[in-house]
Regions:
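Rossmann-like dinucleotide/flavin-binding elements
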Residues: 2-3, 7-30, 112, 123, ...
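Short N-terminal binding/cap micro-motifs at the start of the first secondary-structure element
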Residues: 14-16, 37-40
Length: 163
């Protein structure tokens, strides 16, 4: 079967794309994980998502799940490892399985390098990746930023105004 759209990623961007495609009566397949988004699930409080404030990541994730369930959108747990342009369609590979789609949307989120010891364990409990999202949690506290690029410097300057 060839899908109109294959969406790789089940976080906020991927699910938003899926909802919009479904509304437009596109034949879609969404690849992701059963829990939708590990990073979202671990967020202690979200205040920068329009329409939702002072909501935990887990509660927001549950709202996402309710929304896609109400529209009949399912998340396929196959992990896509390769995508090939085949002319007028794309072949998406997962193990021995191949899926075809006319359009592919990559919504895999931000990928981080090798984790620092304790990083995964404390994600959402002191460790964060988004100054805009997490800065209010660190108001008037001492924070440390680990980063190796211009973006990390900008995040540090932003946090300096709040923490």
């Amino acid at each position: 079967m060839r899908y109109d759209i294959a969406i790789v990623g089940s976080g906020p961007a991927g699910l938003s794309a899926a909802i919009n495609a479904k509304i437009r009566n596109k034949n879609i397949i969404v690849f992701g994980t059963e829990n939708l988004s590990n990073k979202l699930e671990k967020a202690p409080e979200i205040n920068n998502y329009l329409g939702f404030y002072e909501i935990s990541g887990e509660d927001l994730k549950n709202k996402f799940k309710d929304h896609i369930d109400s529209m009949g959108i399912e998340v396929n747990n196959n992990r896509i490892t390769n995508i090939y342009a085949m002319g007028d369609y794309f072949a998406l590979i997962s193990g021995q399985n191949m899926f075809e789609a006319t359009t592919v949307i990559l919504a895999t989120g931000v990928q981080y390098g090798k984790p620092i010891k304790g990083e995964e364990e404390y994600l959402g409990r002191g460790v964060g990746y988004c100054a805009t999202c997490d800065a209010p949690l660190y108001k008037e506290k001492t924070v440390a930023i680990i980063g190796y690029n211009k973006e990390a410097e900008e995040e540090a300057n932003f946090l300096n105004e709040i923490a």
